[in-house]
Amino acid sequence: MDSVVFYMKVNVGSGNPVKVRATENVLGLIYGNVEVRGVEVESGVPDQPVGLEETVRGAVNRARRAFRDCELSVGIESGLHRVPETITGFVDLQWCAIYDGEHITLGVSAGFEYPPMVVEEVLAGREVGDVMDELTGVDELGRKRGAVSFLSGGLLDRTGNTEQCVLMAMIPRMNPSLYGLK
């Protein structure tokens, strides 16, 4: 008897290997056999989002725009968010939007604060990635271990941080009856 192998096709609205790997890691644990591929799409927000609305909109746009020939699409967007009582006034959070053609579910990662000089440069119009590349001497740090790895002394890398937001966005899908999903 021939066995049928089921696998889920998932598109990630980015060519960033960290975002693709994090999505594959989390959805592989949940669904087993997944095919995850990166699809370059426009976020529709500035390259360096600032604020909740802009960052979430970027993640949602990426998820919706990547939805083609797949069961789920994923959009991940990192941005600075105003947070009182922090040294710089800002915390970096990654938002994940997961789209199934009907519903969007959202999740967010643990946040961390960039050094003041990084935030100052970003607020002056530069991208975090460019500033962190200069600070660390690592080209395309955000496509590798990430700023969070550098700043945490390697205790958490960008893949792990990104996995957090993907998993949080999956919670309603893992409990569909509790969230009114099909």
Curated annotation (Swiss-Prot):
Its cofactor is Mg(2+); Mn(2+). Binds 1 divalent metal cation per subunit; can use either Mg(2+) or Mn(2+). One of its GO terms (molecular function) is ITPase activity. The keyword Magnesium applies. It comes from the Archaea. InterPro entries: ITPase-like_fam, Non_canon_purine_NTPase, NTPase/PRRC1, YjjX_NTPase. One of its GO terms (biological process) is thiamine metabolic process. Mg(2+) binds at E42, D69. It catalyses: XTP + H2O = XDP + phosphate + H(+); ITP + H2O = IDP + phosphate + H(+). Keywords: Hydrolase, Magnesium, Manganese, Metal-binding, Nucleotide metabolism, Nucleotide-binding. Its EC number is 3.6.1.73. The keyword Magnesium applies. HAMAP family: Non_canon_purine_NTPase_YjjX. Belongs to the YjjX NTPase family. Homodimer. Phosphatase that hydrolyzes non-canonical purine nucleotides such as XTP and ITP to their respective diphosphate derivatives. Probably excludes non-canonical purines from DNA/RNA precursor pool, thus preventing their incorporation into DNA/RNA and avoiding chromosomal lesions. This is Probable inosine/xanthosine triphosphatase.
